[in-house]
A protein has these predicted regions:
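Acidic, divalent-metal-coordinating active-site segment for phosphoryl/phosphodiester hydrolysis
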Residues: 150, 205-212
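CoA-thioester-processing core
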Residues: 133-135, 143, 149-202, 216, ...
Length: 301
């Protein structure tokens, strides 16, 4: 339960998700619903509806919205290129904390408003935002609606999957000015594309277009046209959310932790997670749905 509404997050609540945010926001005299006495009525009303928007008194650079079991985190400073400063990094951390407290969520979509995802620049020191994103137990799908450079690319690397528009470019141009990545860029990039391509991008500071990014494994999908990005997102979302929530969590854990283990240790981790999964309701549902020739109805338990 939250003690107060988050200062830097706009919350679009569906059903009873983040009920603590309802109460906390109302206690701070939300512009949407003022009297705290209305809380039970509003919470009850929210059942089965599309959602109720709550706007804390202080809005900021990050938006958090919920749609059923998918949370969307949006960088919302398009006029500033969605640059990641300390304020935005703090807001991202708070959004990730809220997401981590909701066991009903199965996927996080991370994107930006405007024509870029997040670009390097500005006179203020960049904030560090990759750690809270990479620490999320559920899959994180990064939707690159435009360029991602410097700290913005480092943030994108903290996700599990990346899709982009065909016009997007990626790189670390700040290296030309002696600025070294400081939010995991030198570590996550080689783990994703391999040390050779990582050195290519880091040492030259050159920009990589969407086509090349796909070929080296920096992104997983490229929309054929900018307007088709939503369709690519919808397809991937359906595939991820339609599977076992526990299976997705364990797969993410096995890959993430396995990268830092020897092969034998990684195989032991994989075996252990399989043993745990075998005892879950989701595993039983998977077997039953196959035998009954129907689609599975996973509960995440």
């Amino acid at each position: 339960m939250l003690e107060r509404a988050p200062d830097l997050v706009k919350i679009d609540v569906s059903g009873l998700v983040f009920r603590g945010c309802f109460k906390a926001a109302f206690k701070r005299r939300s512009p949407v619903v003022d009297p705290i006495l209305n809380i039970p009525k509003i919470v009850e009303k929210s059942k089965g509806e599309a959602g109720i928007a709550i706007y804390p008194l202080t809005t900021g650079p990050v938006l958090l919205s919920l749609n059923a079991n998918v949370a969307t985190i949006t960088l919302d400073r398009p006029d500033n290129g969605n640059r990641i400063d300390e304020e935005m990094a703090a807001a991202l951390g708070e959004a990730c904390r809220l997401v981590s407290e909701d066991d009903g969520l199965r996927l996080v979509v991370l994107t930006g408003n405007g024509n870029v995802f997040s670009i390097e620049g500005g006179s203020t020191a960049p904030g560090r935002s990759g750690a809270p994103v990479s620490a999320l137990a559920i899959p994180v799908l990064v939707v690159l609606n435009g360029d991602a450079t410097g700290p913005g690319l480092e943030l994108a690397l903290a996700g599990d999957l990346r899709i982009c528009v065909p016009s997007a470019h990626f790189g670390f141009p700040g290296l030309a000015n002696g600025v070294l990545p400081q939010d995991g860029g030198t570590q996550r990039l080689p783990r994703l594309v391999g040390p050779s391509w990582a050195r290519d991008m880091l040492l030259t500071g050159r920009m990589v277009d969407a086509k090349e990014a796909l070929s080296i494994g920096l992104v997983n999908r490229v929309a054929e046209q900018t307007g088709q990005l939503a369709a690519v997102l919808a397809e991937l979302t359906a595939q991820i959310v339609g599977g076992s929530p526990l299976g997705a969590r364990y797969a993410k854990e096995a890959v993430g932790k396995g990268m830092d283990l020897s092969l034998d240790q990684g195989l032991e981790l994989e075996a252990d997670l399989n043993v745990i999964l075998q005892s879950t309701s989701d595993r039983a549902e998977g077997i039953n749905s196959f035998l009954e020739k129907r689609g599975p109805k996973f509960t995440g338990s």
